A protein has these predicted regions:
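Membrane-lumen/periplasm interface segments of specific transmembrane helices
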Residues: 282-358
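Interfacial juxtamembrane loops and adjacent helix segments
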Residues: 84-183, 333
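Start-transfer (signal-anchor) and selected internal transmembrane alpha helices
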Residues: 10-56, 296-304
Length: 358
């Protein structure tokens, strides 16, 4: 007991954090078991509660912007939030830097590191100062005015950041602090994943437990509790898988409505990462006999293909052109060892010439 008290005096910040997280864990666990045993719940409802509870815990345990590339997702959601709030006309300065609130400058240019010449991202290297700042932070913003960030947004479909941007917008309307802003964005991202994941669990005729288990992976929980657009990608991927299996095993014939739903998911998902376009090859699992007309099957394949290719080219035309015809400043993966600068990428010529490297 004496050792515990001495540790408390030496590391009060750490112990306050442990007590805070323990109380939250107990409260969430009590609420979960109350709903689980007091009323009969479907697996989809249990899934929704589990994702919201565990995701919220991960969001509190892992410091904001500590997830992979979260600072880039933060800037992308911030830019979309500004457009939602009607600030699109004055979004960037002359150098293309995003306009943000003065309150939010500490997010990607933290001054607590004692290195004014470096733009340290808050949460990238967690230390006691950052934990203390989060503990002492108020709900409302303390600074007024505007500044700019040097971080650049991710070029992808704005749909990927709609829910984090919605959270940012609510926080900015309430004049919330930078921590309020970040946690609102994280919460709305988690909420989106939990809702679509629950729909996927509800619809899929088989493999419900597999989808549930994948969602419980630590990496999955880290991503869905952050600002990452991987929460959006995973949610749509789960929903797509559930629809493909449902279409294959349902008794009713498939029609135009089912094709339209798959096309909408393809339009929303394919521009995010080109590799996810291959996921739609699973559509061939659905037999043409499941359709009301064989012609409708081929029309559906053509429509889904267009729904993948057109948004993909529209959003990722620059990246695709670098792959087909590399630029002068491109650094190929096979030549990158021992070199600095340039833009690392893959291209058709390199892959065909040295497939063992890739």
């Amino acid at each position: 007991m004496t050792n515990l008290l001495s540790l408390w005096r030496e590391h009060p910040v750490f112990f306050r954090e442990c007590i805070f997280l323990s109380l939250i864990s107990i409260a969430f666990a009590a609420g979960f078991f109350f709903f689980l045993f007091r009323r009969k719940m479907k697996l989809a409802q249990i899934y929704f509660l589990s994702m919201m509870i565990l995701g919220s815990l991960y969001s509190f345990v892992l410091m904001p912007l500590s997830a992979p590339d979260e600072v880039l997702h933060y800037v992308s959601a911030y830019a979309l939030s500004s457009e939602m709030l009607g600030q699109g006309g004055r979004l960037y300065d002359g150098d293309g830097n995003l306009r943000i609130r003065k309150e939010d400058e500490e997010i990607d240019d933290w001054t607590g590191d004692g290195k004014p010449e470096e733009a340290t991202v808050f949460g990238m290297h967690i230390n006691r100062k950052q934990v203390e700042e989060r503990q002492k932070a108020s709900f409302f913003a303390q600074e007024k005015g505007y500044g700019f960030t040097l971080q650049k947004p991710v070029k992808t479909t704005p749909l990927a950041y709609f829910f984090p941007a919605l959270g940012f917008s609510f926080a900015r309307i309430l004049y919330g602090s930078r921590f309020t802003l970040l946690y609102f964005g994280r919460f709305f991202n988690l909420l989106f994943f939990s809702i679509l994941g629950s729909l996927a669990i509800e619809k899929i005729p088989m493999g419900k437990e597999i989808l549930f288990s994948i969602s419980l992976f630590p990496m999955t929980l880290e991503l869905i509790s952050s600002l990452s657009y991987d929460a959006y990608i995973l949610a749509l991927s789960f929903l797509f898988l559930s629809m493909v299996f449902e279409y294959q095993f349902r008794e009713e014939k498939l029609g135009i409505k089912e094709i339209v739903w798959i096309c909408l998911i393809a339009i929303a998902l394919s521009p995010c990462k080109m590799v996810y376009s291959l996921l739609f090859l699973l559509c061939v699992m659905v037999s043409f006999k499941r359709f009301s007309s064989p012609w409708l099957y081929f029309i559906g394949i053509f429509a889904i293909g267009l729904s993948i290719v057109l948004p993909l080219l529209l959003v990722n035309l620059d990246a695709f052109s670098r792959y087909v015809r590399p630029q002068e400043d491109t650094v190929n993966l096979s030549n990158i060892v021992g070199q600095d600068g340039g833009m690392e990428t893959y291209n058709r010529r390199e892959i065909l010439a040295q497939p063992d490297v890739y």
